[in-house]
Amino acid sequence: MEEIQRYLQLKRSQQHNFLYPLIFQEYIYAFAHDRIFSRSFLSENTGYENKSSLLIVKRLITRMYQQNPFIIFPNDSTQNQFLGHNKNFYSQLISEGFAFIVEIPFFLRLISSLEGKKKKIVKSQNLRSIHSIFPFLEDSFSHLNFVLDILIPQPVHAEILVQTLRYWVKDASSLHLIRFLLNEYCNWNSLIFPKKASSSFSNSKRNQRNQRLFLFLYNSHVCEYESIFFFLRNQSSHLRSTYSRVLLERIYFYGKIEHLVNVVVKVKDFQANLWLVKEPCMHYVRYQRKSLLASKGTSLFMNKWKCFLVTFWQWHFALWFHPRRIYINQLSKNLLEFLGYLSSVQMNPSVVRSQILENSFLINNAIKKFDTLVPIIPLIASLANTKFCNVLGHPISKPVWADLSDSHIIDRFGRICSNLSHYHSGSSKKKSLYRIKYILRLSCARTLARKHKSTVRAFLKRLGSELLEEFLMSEEDVLFLTFPKASSTLRGVYKSRIWYLDILCISDLVNYK
């Protein structure tokens, strides 16, 4: 990255389009593939298993210099050919390198904005964890009333992504290449948002290789969505956003806001009508396609926000945004499904005895508490889709794992069980997890019994039930094995919700949507 940064500093004053020449540099592909060219990705092309991957990259760069790079061979069985070989292979190769290249200006911008803040960066490493969101929700959402449950729409056409990226990357050649790569993948919509767990996105190696480029394009698209929140926050509050300068550094943005005043609000003075969406206590959270906008305001206020966002997105992105994609939920009455949890704000009653002189009386207080539960029904449905149980939740064997050794089978089931228990450690009611552990335990036993052509009862009787006890260990047991000197009085604390700061992604079983 330092070599690329020096290259950009030298070339920035010489030419404006500084991204496109990096595509012709071999070391870019080394960076993109962690300097390892011998991975299966670079050697899966038919007829080139024994060739050096570096030669493939050199041949690709040489042919990109030619005037007519799109060579079609009619005698080949593949209908679409690109650069003399399979079109998908070289498109994947270019997209991997280009995905690394197009992230460089954003990386340099981030580094420049964080200079002199290294101590803050070290302290904020734990914020990378998904579980770091929930302590924020506990502190903030318990005092709020309504929340907008927003499903961010995906763009209906690839050109929308290119136009969005045009405000970030001032490089016409790179934008043309992005447009070409998107046109190469006609089913790019399903690559970003798979509708089913068995879709090509989750199983196909080709789609996994291009995931980085597509996710980068989609994230730039989402940043465009979120820009309106930063703008309204800075206009309607004295508290300025510290990251808005980096996020909103795009051409024509404030020109769009001026048109937004005339088209959406239909008034001349935008500042005088910010009361429509002005709220000093608003919180915004997003993960993947789902975002939450919580407020202390009334239902009428949230309806104004809903109409404002729908109209803004439809006009700004020229696509149809259905109002039903935004749900208005009252936190005290509705369950909020977010990040594999069912969340709500519950009233926790408490009684306080007070005594003044000879008179004593009771004071009933109701304290709002942010509650998180495990969605047991969707989780069982996810286990049924992966063939650990049937649709009713009855455990079944896993035939595809029957050829593995006993230790590998137990290790796989134990890893799944511990990951689910680890992720759902923040649930206020742990009884739902016991059913999931029971399904996985019995599924493991039936898989082992199927392998040894025996019954579950006979297998457990012969080897002992302790064989499956290891991966059924609870989180609090793991903590007390790690800290054996912990007092027994703390066991009640550990039985409550635990948020871990080492969870960087959601398991496929949890991400059942």
From Swiss-Prot:
One Gene Ontology term, aspect cellular component: chloroplast
Gene Ontology biological process terms, A to Z: mRNA processing; RNA splicing; tRNA processing
Subcellular locations according to the entry: Plastid, Chloroplast
Single annotated GO MF: RNA binding
Entry's transmembrane regions: none
Keywords assigned: Chloroplast, mRNA processing, Plastid, RNA-binding, tRNA processing
Superkingdom of this protein's organism: Eukaryota
Record HAMAP family: MatK
Family membership: Belongs to the intron maturase 2 family. MatK subfamily.
Functional description taken from the UniProt entry: Usually encoded in the trnK tRNA gene intron. Probably assists in splicing its own and other chloroplast group II introns.
The protein's name in its UniProt record: Maturase K
Gene name in the database record: matK
